[in-house]
Amino acid sequence: KKVYGDDLKAVYDKSSGTAPFKAGLELVDGYMYKKEGFSDDEQVVLENGHKFIVNWTEGQKTGFFLDQRENRALVGSLSKGRNVLNLFCYTGGFSIYALASGALHVDSVDSSKKAMMMVDRNVALNGFDPSLHTSLCCDAIDYLKNVPEGKYDLMIVDPPAFAKHRGSLKNA
């Protein structure tokens, strides 16, 4: 609160599902701080001029992966004039940057219907021509197996963690 002052609207702790079990911490997801009048519903966040709908409570982890900010910017810098494939797209962060940077077309692929609806909403929120983007709700690996050679100039492959720790590596 000292850093953001009145601009701080909420602090939501969502570490119960991500903190190592061995840490022995009793973690409960919830608000650590919430400004009066702050809605629990979706919020729009702004990153480098791009808007993203985020649901802190319902989304995966935080609902938006802040640690990928530099990678999204890198994808943007490589996307102009290219056909882009974003596999495991979740809410479409890489897709938005590619579109904003002048990609010819972006295909976003994820197996989650909910995630694909969010990608479409984020594309609309940022005012992109919907004909430049296609959302494909299917298994990303199966899709990749059937992609014709040369269809894409740039591919983003950012899968979820299949194994969170060494003990579950065999099952992953």
Question: What residues fall within each predicted segment?
Answer:
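Mobile active-site "lid"/loop adjacent to the S-adenosyl-L-methionine
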Residues: L154-A172
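Conserved SAM-binding motif I beta-strand of class I
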Residues: H105-D110
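Conserved class I S-adenosyl-L-methionine
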Residues: G81-Y90
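Conserved alpha-helix/loop element of class I SAM-dependent methyltransferases that forms part
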Residues: L66-R82
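S-adenosyl-L-methionine
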Residues: K114-I156
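Local beta-strand N-terminus motif with an aromatic residue
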Residues: L8, G81, K151-D153
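Conserved SAM-binding loop of SAM-dependent methyltransferases across substrates and taxa
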Residues: T91-L104
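Non-catalytic substrate-recognition/targeting regions of SAM-dependent transferases
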Residues: K2-F64
